[in-house]
Curated annotation (Swiss-Prot):
GO terms for molecular function: DNA binding; N-methyltransferase activity; site-specific DNA-methyltransferase (adenine-specific) activity. One of its GO terms (biological process) is methylation. Belongs to the N(4)/N(6)-methyltransferase family. The keyword Metal-binding does not apply. It comes from Enterobacter cloacae. The gene is ecaIM. This is Type II methyltransferase M.EcaI. One of its GO terms (cellular component) is cytoplasm. It catalyses: a 2'-deoxyadenosine in DNA + S-adenosyl-L-methionine = an N(6)-methyl-2'-deoxyadenosine in DNA + S-adenosyl-L-homocysteine + H(+). Disulfide bonds: none annotated. InterPro entries: DNA_methylase_N4/N6, DNA_methylase_N6_adenine_CS, N4/N6-MTase_EcoPI_Mod-like, SAM-dependent_MTases_sf. Keywords: DNA-binding, Methyltransferase, Restriction system, S-adenosyl-L-methionine, Transferase.
Length: 452
């Protein structure tokens, strides 16, 4: 008996694919993980080695060694050292939010021209800088915790790969696009850059989620509830549902049966009541649908496009004057969605302290980390006297927050909730930055004086 392939098999798709394999090397096996490779990529076991970094608790006129970092604290330190310390202490956060440098190659200063930080790392150095810190954050994040990484377009793709590598691709929750500013009519050679992004990952399969809701805008309401009558604005929905039923909801109503494979959502008696009250709409072809009226408490969930959280864009918005300060309402939404009262929230690049402020208002515990002296002073000033309207930072007749009219200071101060505020500094920073430490102590004295 002859054995072999017939002409159809020889010329068929399977045979052609086999020939193509000889022309192109085999693809990686299904399920193979993607990793980033670059010079200087440190072994994870080295990153997770415990460091014996001593931290000093700072007071108005002292700085003494502390065995434990308390909740509701700002840590003035390199965040890799501080995160390692929190890991060693066994701290567990339900939420970590970070707004790190974006690899822009730029320096950033405040509205009063005080230097805040340099964003000078690029490519491999930037990725390894972030990787080492994200690995430590993974260890600190609780099993039902969530991490939000706020980033620009510059390293978005690379950071997505990095987060997939560290947390697992299956732990990806969302890529949120945020409208950060108004239209830029001056852009000529490319599309205007109006957005930045938030990568959201969970530590485990289950995570805290308190679904945030908002009031729909007029455009959405007009599309969703396009009809009106004497009772108000309404939309039409079917009165049948999938599935065959053999009871009353599968029988006749007003001489007609449900469509094939479906049943009435209500009994014929209930449908009669709805029809008599004018809550059934009959089309010209005799198709009945139920009217669903718009209610005053109507709310909808957020999508992954956030256009209502632009950064300060008019002069009445309250700000600290810190560069890259993020929208405070956005921070309250994130903290509320991914943590519960009493949970620990950590921001390792805390800058102006928006995350800490939101956590405090929503009765969460918090820890903020930043190595910038200006960030440290900004956070303490924020907790002492609150923020100021943005217009005051361009009004030369006022000396920023310190010379605001009392009424404005009192209004801003009402944002603050707790008097519980601690500040720590690592021993090395304290020893080599004595003048800066003195500034920190002065700011701390001012904070405590304003909290009386």
């Amino acid at each position: 008996m002859a054995v072999g392939l017939n002409k159809k098999e020889i010329d068929g798709p399977a045979s052609q694919r086999a020939v193509a394999c000889d022309l192109e090397p085999a693809l990686p096996p299904i399920g193979a993980r993607v990793t980033l490779n670059y010079p200087g990529k440190m072994d994870e076991s080295i990153i997770l080695q415990k460091k014996d970094t001593k931290y000093l608790r700072v007071g108005s006129d002292f700085a003494k060694e502390s065995s434990l970092i308390l909740p509701n604290s700002f840590i003035w330190s390199d965040n890799s050292l501080a995160l390692n310390r929190l890991m060693v202490e066994g701290k567990k956060a339900k939420l970590i939010y970070l707004d790190p440098p974006y690899a822009t190659g730029m320096g950033f200063s405040s509205r009063s021209n005080e230097h805040a930080y340099d964003d000078c790392l690029t490519e491999a150095a930037y990725l390894e800088f972030m990787r080492r810190r994200l690995i430590l954050m993974r260890e600190i994040l609780d099993d039902d915790g969530t991490i939000y990484v706020h980033i620009g377009h510059q390293m978005l793709g690379e950071l997505k790969c990095l987060l997939d590598e560290i947390f697992g691709r299956e732990r990806f929750i969302n890529l949120i696009t945020r409208r950060k500013c108004s239209s830029k009519n001056s852009t000529k050679n490319n599309f205007a850059n109006l957005n930045d992004y938030i990568l959201c990952y969970s530590k485990g399969k289950k995570y805290i989620w308190n679904r945030p809701l908002k009031k729909p805008d007029a455009e959405w309401l007009a599309k969703e509830y396009p009809k009106t009558d004497s009772k108000g604005q309404f939309k039409l929905v079917p009165i049948h549902a999938p599935g065959v039923r053999h009871g009353a909801t599968g029988g006749e109503w007003k001489g007609m049966l449900p469509p094939p494979g479906k049943h009435w959502q209500y009994t014929p008696e209930k449908l009669d009541i709805l029809d008599a009250s004018g809550d059934i709409h009959w089309s010209k072809t005799g198709n009945p649908r139920r009217k669903v009226y718009l209610t005053d408490d109507k709310s909808i969930g957020y999508t992954d496009y956030w256009e209502e959280f632009r950064d300060a864009h008019h002069q009445s918005i309250l700000v600290t004057g810190y560069p890259t300060e993020k929208n405070f309402n956005m921070m309250k939404l994130i903290v509320g969605a991914s943590s519960n009262p009493g949970d620990l929230v950590i921001d390792p690049f805390c800058g102006s302290g928006s995350t800490l402020h939101a956590a405090s208002l929503l009765q969460r515990k918090w820890i903020g980390i930043d190595e910038s002296l200006f960030a440290a002073k900004t956070v303490m000033k924020r907790f002492a006297i609150g923020r100021a309207p943005m217009g005051d930072y361009v009004n030369t007749s006022l000396n920023k927050q310190t010379e605001l009219p009392l009424s404005l200071n009192e209004t801003a101060r009402h944002e603050y909730v707790s008097n519980d505020f601690n500040i720590y500094v690592d021993e090395l920073t304290a020893s080599v930055s004595k003048n800066e430490l003195a500034e920190i102590q002065k700011a701390y004295r001012d904070l405590k004086a304003n909290q009386q």
